[in-house]
């Protein structure tokens, strides 16, 4: 609904993020059909993180499928079928995204994962937020064989607390010591500066 409101009221192109953590396959299918009905066609498929490190650590996860299963659900809907094999009134027209992890410890394994995601229906890749440009360059080079757009993620840091949380708690996000030091000294202002600097450097990759 937020994606729809931004597109409808603000004319901002959105990418609807959908994870497997909170819904079974019927719920995931329902979310996707609802998005299609609202004209939200760009989606990012994610497995999702367990709630352990969030503000609702007591919540139960679902994970009936992972991101590969969610990709297949979207691909099936695009082919005009639901999960039970019934014909839809019209096929959906999702532009399907998958995640990439430049911070993965083994980029060859990451390459194999991306190949499988593309085979399962991914049209584009959106990475975890980038805070290490050399890491991003290595990732782009490793994935150069794939003929799909790769969007490098960028999230401005608001505080040193946020920076340390991302660095220590979120898999695949690695901040350099230089960035951590700058955030400790400069807070939100430093985070804005880092985001602008990173964006300018990303444009050159």
Residue ranges and their predicted role:
Residues 1-13, 94, 184-188:
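Flavin-dependent oxidoreductase catalytic cores
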Residues 1-5, 24-30, 50-87, 106-109, ...:
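Active-site-adjacent beta->alpha loops and helix N-cap segments on the catalytic face
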Residues 10-14, 39-41, 90-96, 122-123, ...:
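Short, well-ordered coil/turn segments that N-cap beta-strands
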Residues 14-18, 43-45, 96-100, 118, ...:
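Hydrophobic faces of well-ordered beta-strands that scaffold small-molecule active sites
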Residues 16-51:
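A generic, well-ordered mixed alpha/beta core segment in the N-terminal half of proteins
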Residues 24-36, 108-115, 137-141, 160-162, ...:
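Catalytic cores of alpha/beta
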Residues 48, 61-89, 99-104, 145-197:
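Active-site pocket-lining/capping segments in soluble small-molecule metabolic enzymes
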Residues 87-131:
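Internal active-site segments that recognize and position negatively charged phosphoryl groups
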């Amino acid at each position: 609904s937020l994606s729809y409101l931004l597109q409808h009221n603000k004319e901002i192109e959105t990418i609807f993020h959908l994870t497997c953590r909170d819904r079974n396959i019927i719920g995931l299918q329902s979310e996707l059909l609802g998005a299609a009905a609202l004209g939200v066609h760009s989606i990012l498929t994610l497995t999702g993180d367990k709630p352990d490190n969030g503000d609702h650590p007591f919540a139960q996860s679902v994970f009936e499928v992972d991101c590969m299963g969610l990709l297949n659900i979207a691909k099936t809907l695009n082919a005009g079928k639901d999960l039970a094999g019934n014909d839809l009134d019209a096929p959906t027209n999702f532009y399907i995204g998958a995640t990439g992890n430049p911070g993965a410890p083994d980029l060859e394994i990451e390459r194999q994962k991306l190949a499988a995601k593309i085979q399962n229906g991914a049209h584009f890749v959106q990475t975890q937020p980038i805070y290490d440009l050399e890491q991003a360059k290595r990732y782009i080079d490793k994935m150069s064989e794939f003929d799909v757009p790769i969007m490098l993620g960028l999230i401005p840091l608001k505080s040193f607390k946020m920076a340390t949380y991302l660095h220590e708690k979120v898999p695949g996000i690695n901040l350099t010591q230089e960035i951590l030091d700058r955030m400790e000294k400069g807070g939100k202002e430093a985070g804005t500066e880092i985001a602008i600097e990173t964006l300018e450097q990303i444009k050159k990759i």
